[in-house]
A protein has these predicted regions:
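Intrinsically disordered, low-complexity segments enriched in small/flexible residues
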Residues: 3, 7, 18-53, 59-70, ...
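Short acidic, glycine-rich surface-loop motifs adjacent to enzyme active sites
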Residues: 77, 81-93, 331-346
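Conserved catalytic cores of soluble enzyme domains
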Residues: 89-226, 342-482, 486-487, 514
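Well-ordered beta-strand positions
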Residues: 137-138, 239-240, 337, 388-389, ...
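Beta->alpha turn/N-cap motifs
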Residues: 145, 243-245, 504-506
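Active-site-proximal helix/loop microenvironment
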Residues: 221-242, 479-503
Length: 599
């Protein structure tokens, strides 16, 4: 990618100061580095999680450090004759529920081959506590940790009464009776429709979560925590209390070898830490270069917008960058099939439509499949419908086909404080001031403007239905039955034709190889980081920027992003970020009406 290399050159003076000397991964006490043909325990270090996208902040992560890299590492480990066992380290975190379900299924394949799978966690979450029940033959919990497996619940915060006290008027509309996005601003509790949809989706997700535990006692305990380590052992959630070194020793004992190879995570063998070359390599996309026929995975994670920026943006999916990625893949002779990995609550309908359009063009040239992580909701599902086939995990959320939009009117509250405003329209026609300032927080909507906004939303909703119908090859009437803004679990979506198969990223890659007619052991590249970095920094492709410009842009971006995001509790950030298009001048969003995260 031409400008990706220029970006690396421009950033060189800046990042040389933060480069580190290349160091070998430290060996655990009792571990040895394996020779080429020696039997070994392969280790998965999940202490830093498994990010879906390459951009784990301002700099791109190596492709091997993404969730796709984790799936590939397991695929290779399963095929290797030298694998004698598996060690999984969680630390205090690990995986979200959709990832945990797929990785657990992959690890059971090692167990079926008679290979030990030893897992260690400093602390367990809902997702990892269920994971270890299914995936691990031996389960360790840190003596000072805890098992925070407490069951699943959703919390929605309602602000209607507070806004009333502050004299802030809420002008929000929605299309779809289940599209409850504005409800927290308009009501003090959920509508019957919102309660019905959320109860049904949570119940289905809960069923998939509990199904990870095969033993009845452990399954029951998943909803009874939090537990101290001794109580977690008593309830059958873990086998032993101990440190990571104890789990390492047990893995070596069961595998009958002291050789260990870290195949995933920040401690990957021979790749401990970043040096300057690795950062430049990642920025330029160099590690993804291969002329051999292969499958490309395109991670699309986060809120959807037309471009990077906005007060609450945390990166996410931008049509500005993603369209370039998809067009490049369409023209690549080496890329024989594409898997789009989606985890998004939605966002801009315009950006969603632009990406959908490129996927539809791409699938005319080569197979395009979608793999859903935590969710493909609203705008996320809009994009997913552009793929020929959609895979989703049992806990994935899909659907939410609907739109909402509006604004908060601050003028009554400001008037109470002695602040007044007056709009001077250029035209003196009746209603000109209301029309010209229809997105202003100082001008309330009149009936005519509200009617026009409602018509605008209905048009976007109708287009949303038509796009899903075209992409999924369904009648629009059938899509409407599952629309109205309602969310669905993946099993519910399968029954309704919204997805094609319950399965994870690995199944999607296998299918893509088959459809693309590439070998089963062919490479898998992870695409998408280099295209967006200059856009993120507000430096266009044609800018002649020097190191000073880039350094200033880096500082500007981080300061703006950090200040805004620090105002929002972490669990609400995905939803708030999906509203970024409203702050960028769009009147309507296609977004999940609340933050939905299962840990």
């Amino acid at each position: 990618v031409g400008f990706g290399r220029r970006a690396a050159a421009l950033l060189l003076p800046f990042i040389v100061a933060c480069s580190t000397r290349h160091r070998a991964a430290p060996s655990e006490e009792g571990s040895t580095r394996p020779s080429k043909h020696e039997q070994r325990v392969i280790e998965l270090d999940l202490t830093a999680g498994a990010p879906e996208a390459l951009s784990g902040g301002l700099f791109a992560l190596p492709a091997t450090r993404t969730y796709t890299g984790l799936v590939r590492a397991l695929e290779k480990g399963l095929a290797a004759d030298t694998t004698a066992g598996v060690l999984v380290r969680f630390g205090e975190g690990g995986l979200d529920l959709a990832q945990a379900q797929e990785v657990a299924d992959l690890l059971t394949r090692f167990s079926k081959k008679g290979l030990p799978v030893v897992c260690h966690a400093d602390g367990l979450t809902n997702a990892t506590a269920a994971f270890v029940q299914r995936a691990c033959t031996r389960r360790y919990l840190g003596p000072a940790g805890e098992a925070e497996t407490v069951g699943l619940a959703a919390q929605v915060v309602y602000l209607h009464s507070l806004l009333d006290r502050l004299k802030i008027e809420v002008d929000f509309l929605h299309v779809g009776k289940f599209k409850s996005g504005p409800e927290p601003l308009l009501q003090d509790g959920p509508s019957p429709e919102a309660r019905e949809a959320l109860d049904a989706a949570l119940g289905s997700v809960r069923d998939g979560w509990l199904a990870l535990a095969s033993k009845p006692d452990a399954r029951a305990a998943l909803e009874l925590g939090p537990f101290s380590p001794p109580d977690a052992k008593t309830h059958g959630l873990v086998d032993e209390l101990g440190y990571a070194s104890d789990a390492v020793a047990e893995a070596h004992r069961l595998a009958k070898t002291t050789a260990t190879e870290v195949v995933y995570g920040p401690r990957t063998s021979g790749k401990h830490g970043f040096d300057l070359g690795e950062i430049v390599h990642a920025l330029t996309g160099g590690e993804n270069e291969t002329s051999s026929p292969h499958v490309a995975v395109v991670p699309m994670q986060g809120a959807i917008s037309t471009s990077a920026g906005g007060p609450f943006s945390s990166g996410g999916i931008t049509s500005q960058a993603m369209v370039k990625v998809l067009q490049r893949l369409a023209h690549s002779d080496a890329v024989k099939a594409v898997v789009v990995r989606i985890d998004s609550p939605g966002g801009s309908p315009l950006a969603s439509d632009l990406i959908w359009h490129e996927l539809m063009n791409l699938r005319k040239k080569k197979p395009v499949l979608a793999s859903v992580g935590g969710m493909a909701a609203s705008g996320g599902f809009y994009i997913a419908s552009g793929a020929q086939k959609i895979y989703a995990e049992p806990s994935s959320i899909v659907g939410s086909i609907g739109v909402f939009g509006g604004k908060l009117v601050l003028s009554p509250g400001l008037k109470e404080l002695g602040v007044s405003s007056f709009t001077f329209p250029a035209s003196h026609a009746e209603g000109a001031a209301e029309r010209a300032g229809y997105l202003s927080p100082l001008v309330p909507w009149n009936d005519e403007t509200r009617g026009r906004v409602r018509a605008l939303m209905q048009g976007i909703y109708d287009l949303f239905i038509a796009r899903v119908a075209e992409g999924r090859k369904m009648a629009a009437e059938k899509v409407l039955v599952s629309a109205e803004g309602r969310i669905w679990s993946a099993p519910q979506g399968l029954e309704r034709g919204l997805i094609d198969q319950i399965g994870g990223l690995q199944e999607a890659i296998v299918e893509a190889r088959t459809l693309g007619k590439v070998p089963v052991d062919s490479a898998v590249t992870v695409e998408g980081a280099a295209e967006g970095i200059l856009d993120m920094l507000n430096l266009g492709d044609d800018d002649e920027a020097d190191a000073a410009h880039v350094s200033a842009a880096l500082a500007r971006y981080e300061a703006r992003r950090t200040i805004a995001l620090d105002l929002i509790p972490e669990e609400f950030r995905p939803f708030v970020a999906s509203l970024t298009p409203l702050f960028q001048g769009e009147a309507v969003v296609a977004a999940l009406p609340y933050a939905f995260t299962v840990r």
